[in-house]
Amino acid sequence: MIGRSEMTSALVEELRIWNTPVIGAYLIYRFVKTFAQERPDKRPPDLIMLCLAIAVLSDRRLSNNIRLRRGISSFRRYLEGEKNAVAFDGIHDVVAKTLPYTLAAIDIGLACGIVRVNAESATIEAVDFRARKGTNEIITDAITDDVKIIETLAKWFAKYENSSVVADKLEVLL
C-alpha cells in the first residue's frame, strides 16, 4: 500500500513536469500573451506555433537548452550537433504526440477564460485577467522554469512572420 506522503510526492512530481492540461493551459496563456506583446502588430500566434512550442517544451533534452540570451540561431546550432540531431529528428513525432495535450490545454484555457478564439483571424488570444492576490505567484513558483522557457520561445517565434518561417529556422517539416 502506498503511503500518503508517497502519493503526495508523486502528485507533486507529476504537476512539476506539467503533465496536466491545466498547467498546459497556463503555459499556453503565457506563450500567447508574450508572443503578442513582442509583435509590433500585436498579432497572436497561430496553432502551429503553439504546437511547436509545446512539443519543444515537452522534450526536456530540448527545453533545457533554451536560453533567451542565446537566441533561436544558437538553439538551431545546438540541434545541429551530432548527438542533438537525434533528439530533434523526432520533433514531428513529438508534435503529433503532444497535439491532443495541446488541444486539451487550449480547451481548458477557453473554459477558464484565460484565452479566447478570434474567429476572424483563426488565432488564440490571451485574455487579461486579474488573479486574486498571491494566486499567480503560487502557480508560477511551481513551474517557473517552464514559464521562462515558454516565454523565451514566444519571444523567438514572434520575430518571424509566420509559422513556416519558424519551422524553417528550426528545420521542421510542417
Language-model segments: residues:
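Helix-adjacent hinge/juxtasegments
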Residues: 76-100
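Glycine-rich, aromatic-bearing surface loops/beta-hairpins
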Residues: 130-174
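Long, hydrophobic N-terminal alpha-helical segment
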Residues: 6-59
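Minor-groove-contacting beta-hairpin "wing" of winged helix-turn-helix DNA-binding domains
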Residues: 122-127
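Long, compositionally biased intrinsically disordered regions
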Residues: 1-5
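A glycine-rich, hydrophobic loop/mini-helix early in the fold
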Residues: 45-82
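Basic amphipathic alpha-helical segments that dock to polyanions
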Residues: 102-116
